[in-house]
Amino acid sequence: MSLKKLITEVAVVDSMFDVEQELMNIKESILEQVIVEGVDDPGILKCIFMAGGPGSGKSFTAMEIFGIDKRLKTSFSHTGLKTVNSDSAFEKGLKDNGIDGKKLAQIEKEDPELWDKIANNDDSIRNKAKAITQLQRKFYEVGRLGMIIDGTGHVYSKIQKNKKHAESLGYDTYMVFVNTSLEVAKERNQNRDRVLSDELLTKSWGDVQNNLGKFQNLFGGNFRIVDNTVYKPISGQVQKAVNNFVKKRVYNPIGKKWISTARALKNANIIKK
């Protein structure tokens, strides 16, 4: 099975809420092929974190920067980067349970039992979606495929931990911070498929803002801010910086060693192509 065919199959699987079982059925031999066939893929060993509060327009920004088709449930960009985002699985879970995402704020206030089922219980819809997405991410990591980690960034330690994990696998890391005013975020929230309460949105927005300086220190030169208060084309400066990062040779010594080993295996036909 070619890498292209495998990725296509995962795209189909990702549109299903039962993706966990599907991913667990992938054979080790196929994963080995991902390792050797993917070594020369675009975006290999590049990991870009998207951060920004609810309503900041991260999806719009990702679409603009990476050429991601917003109509796709699973996003595979022309850069070779694969989007890791639990929103699709979460929205599918809500739909399967007959829950209107636009009523989440109302449910949080009026139906604590249902809200626990959605967001708080160990087996909540949200936690199941996160678990599924984590499995998908692990699949990408096996082949060191390039990734866009799409999250809010309201918990600094989580980003810090995920960055360290990615770098331990050999990835070069980068962050695009999508910024907007609280007023605009609240306005956009009302037009989202999942409407959050003002209290939850305000807290998340504040947490993300408080982490801005920390993120700048954490990522150093591999950090760009996008002002998305008004939807507009991404600045050429940001676009160029991100493109250069993706296209540059892998800098991480662990990643360099992985590429050398995988390429040697591929050239020696140790694992059938």
What spans do the regions from the language model cover?
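Phosphate-binding P-loop
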Residues: 38-45, 139-141
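The conserved Walker
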Residues: 53-54
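Conserved lysine of the Walker
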Residues: 58
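Hydrophobic positions on the alpha1 helix immediately C-terminal to the Walker A/P-loop
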Residues: 61
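Conserved GTP-binding G-domain of TRAFAC-class P-loop NTPases and closely related GTPase folds
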Residues: 182-273
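N-terminal pre-Walker A segment at the start of P-loop NTPase domains
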Residues: 11-39
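Conserved substrate/cofactor phosphate-moiety recognition/catalytic segment
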Residues: 65-143, 157
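Conserved phosphate-donor/acceptor-positioning beta-strand/loop module used by diverse small-molecule
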Residues: 154, 167-187
